[in-house]
């Protein structure tokens, strides 16, 4: 250290405010202004900027109105559960606000036609299909450090294959290689993510642990680093099929907020994902309207302000699609009652997450 170290004196004889001022001035000389500041004076830390997830119910369940910018988010679940769909809806919502989004397609499986149907402006979406995990994370680091990207999706952690594994032979045992890669990348990325206010969404897959007798045998790939660095972790599951006559036209989906550093966790919400359409906004407005008491349900009939909307859920959804004014009115009322709804949304017990452990808020 070029500056002389502060002299340590007895607590009884020192003036704490003067000592603190001296320490702060030394830190600012050495590391620059703003290296240490009072939390309340840092406006950025007080105001959480969010982007809608594309699901009205999930935005309410998250407690802050959407997914937070400047943070790491993990979306995990079984195959075909809606992980990429949810991430693409977030991209579409960010683009509506004029944001720049990037998609690192490590799985080489992004369908631009499906993305366009979800509302993504594919002509404005930056995409990279890297050859190996190190390249993917270097590209992510460069994009985050630029400060120009609002949302960055990495799909998926399981597909971030280390270069050494690609160059090796089939059957080579390389234990912990991907976990070390993720741990190093997140150590580098985390400060840049906060400074650039970029939301980084990692999509992850589920694997089964062998020989587990108690708790959940499920675990996510890529080691434990992502679990610690993520501010929000979402567990998405398909819980049923939506049929039109005998044809399956969509999935009933449940999302549980397993970890949330910004609001109380463990809330869960259900919505419909329709094939070729994505998250069904009409279905959510109908379900949340019933929970908030804005839409009345009597038997199979749905009604609003004494006006019948239809018999059965699908007919009521069709009525909402045909009457955008009524839909907008119900949506405004739902948003005004979001505090009440947040309490009514089923709060799951802190069940064991995808690692057989009780999730912590950190």
Curated annotation (Swiss-Prot):
Matches recorded under SUPFAM superfamilies: P-loop containing nucleoside triphosphate hydrolases (SSF52540), RecA protein, C-terminal domain (SSF54752)
Gene3D superfamilies: P-loop containing nucleotide triphosphate hydrolases
Gene Ontology molecular function: any one: damaged DNA binding
Keyword DNA-binding: yes
Annotated ATP binding sites: 77-84
Cited Pfam families: RecA, RecA_C
Keywords for the protein's UniProt record, in alphabetical order: ATP-binding, Cytoplasm, DNA damage, DNA recombination, DNA repair, DNA-binding, Nucleotide-binding, SOS response
Localization per Swiss-Prot or TrEMBL: Cytoplasm
Keyword Calcium: no
CDD domains, per database record: RecA (cd00983)
Superkingdom classification of source: Bacteria
Biological-process GO terms, alphabetical: DNA recombination; DNA repair; SOS response
GO cellular component, one term: cytosol
NCBIfam families recorded: tigrfam_recA
Chain's role: Can catalyze the hydrolysis of ATP in the presence of single-stranded DNA, the ATP-dependent uptake of single-stranded DNA by duplex DNA, and the ATP-dependent hybridization of homologous single-stranded DNAs. It interacts with LexA causing its activation and leading to its autocatalytic cleavage.
Family in the record: Belongs to the RecA family.
This protein's name: Protein RecA
Species whose genome carries this gene: Nitrobacter hamburgensis (strain DSM 10229 / NCIMB 13809 / X14)
């Amino acid at each position: 250290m070029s500056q002389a170290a502060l002299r340590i004196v007895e607590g009884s004889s020192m003036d704490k405010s003067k000592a603190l001022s001296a320490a702060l001035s030394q830190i600012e000389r050495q590391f620059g202004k703003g290296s240490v500041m009072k939390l309340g004076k840092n406006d950025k830390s007080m105001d959480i900027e969010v982007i809608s997830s594309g699901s009205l119910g999930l935005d309410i369940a998250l407690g802050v109105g959407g997914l937070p910018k400047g943070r790491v988010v993990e979306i995990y679940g079984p195959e075909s559960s809606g992980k990429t769909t949810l991430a693409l809806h977030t991209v579409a919502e960010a683009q509506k606000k004029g944001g720049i989004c990037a998609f690192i397609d490590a799985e080489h499986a992004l369908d631009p036609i499906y993305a366009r149907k979800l509302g993504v402006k594919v002509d404005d979406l930056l995409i990279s299909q890297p050859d190996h995990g190190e390249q993917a994370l270097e590209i992510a680091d460069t994009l985050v450090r630029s400060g120009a990207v609002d949302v960055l999706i990495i799909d998926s952690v399981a597909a971030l294959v280390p270069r050494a594994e690609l160059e090796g032979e089939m059957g080579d045992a390389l234990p912990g290689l991907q976990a070390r890669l993720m741990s190093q990348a997140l150590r580098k990325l985390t400060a840049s993510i906060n400074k650039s206010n970029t939301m980084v969404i990692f999509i992850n897959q589920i694997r089964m642990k062998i020989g587990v007798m108690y708790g959940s045998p499920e675990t996510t790939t890529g080691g434990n680093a992502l679990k610690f660095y993520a501010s929000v972790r979402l567990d998405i599951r398909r819980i049923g099929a939506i049929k039109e006559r005998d044809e399956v036209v969509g999935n009933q989906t449940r999302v549980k907020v397993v970890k949330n550093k910004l609001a109380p966790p463990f809330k869960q919400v259900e919505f419909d994902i329709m094939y070729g359409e994505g998250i069904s906004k009409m279905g959510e407005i109908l379900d949340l309207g019933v929970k908030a008491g804005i839409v009345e349900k009597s038997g199979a009939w749905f009604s609003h302000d004494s006006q019948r909307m239809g018999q059965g859920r699908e007919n009521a959804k069709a009525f909402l699609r045909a009457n955008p004014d009524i839909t907008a009115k119900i949506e405004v009322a739902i948003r005004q009652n979001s505090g009440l709804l947040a309490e009514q949304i089923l709060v799951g017990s802190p069940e064991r997450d995808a690692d057989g452990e009780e999730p912590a808020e950190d």
